[in-house]
Amino acid sequence: RLFPEIWDFPLIQSAYNRIASIEKFLYPRSLKVLTKRQLEALESEVMSDALFMLEVEIAFAILMSAVLKDYFKLQPQSCFGYSVGETSMAFAQGIWGNFSEASKAFNSSKLFSSRLSDSKDAVREHWGLSKEQNLGEFWRNYLLMADVSQVKEAIKNEQRVYLTQINTPNEIVIAGEPAACERVINNIGCNAIPAPFNHVIHCEAMASESPE
């Protein structure tokens, strides 16, 4: 509502239909005020949907970039992105094409529905686990407040723990088998919390998906 002109910009037009669908899920409508429990359930549903989270970040990047570039006329001299930010940056700067078409490709692929999320078949195959076996929660991500060198040393003997992100020299994300990750945390003796997302990112266990 603050920047109505952006809806006429080509980049926004290319993404409008998908952004409209995302917005309805991100900001649910109700004739009654939702309870705290209902809101928490919706938040949990959103956080567990890796593809939806990816598309939300891309959509916001496109919208904010349109406001800054086309409304305020601020043109970047360079751009970079970290993790999903790299994908968001590429769409927001028009390096990659039509977001709505890309969204259709994302949603028709098994990459985010079963390969890296939900049943996590890529991990099962990498670890030699049966797809039919009910393993419960066999993958988890953790945020550690620890020195990166400590973490690298601590995971050397753990075959199912991966260092997935180095946010800062003292803020690290590891992922893998929960029991093995917790051994690493206990051995280091650092503060750590489970990450709010549970999909597979940035590690050897998803190497089979690189071609896609």
Where are these regions (language model features)?
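Short, surface-exposed "cap/lid" segments of acyl-processing enzymes
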Residues: 1-28
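Short, glycine/acidic-rich hinge or "gate" loops at secondary-structure transitions
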Residues: 29-39
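Acyltransferase
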Residues: 38-212
